[in-house]
Amino acid sequence: MSIVGIVIVSHSPKVAEGAADMVRQMVGLEVPLAWTGGGPAGELGTSFEAITEAIHRAWSDAGVAILVDLGGAETNSEMAIEMLAEEKRSRVVICNAPIVEGAVIAATEASGGANLATVRRTAEELSP
């Protein structure tokens, strides 16, 4: 059984890594997980190339849920999705959810075998 992968995208590499660390400690290693954040010199920012690489690292035939912090992360995630092969695009979604809580609940759902739509819906239920 394929498990939905999770990608965490933050402008801060420390935030992205910290959120990923929380996910790992709470759900273990079975959920495909990748994170990316910051610019090439460690400054704040995001890169659609790095996001594309993270999607590939977390890839699962069950799909990939992306959690982002701010607008630029979402825009670059959308660009990264558009750069994927056509057959993969429909299996990658951006969740409108708080990055830390959303990543944890999305990974928890994924670890239980939930499909991509359920993972996304559950994460987005955390939004105000």
Language-model-detected regions and their locations in the chain:
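N-terminal loops that bind phosphate or other acidic moieties
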Residues: 1-128
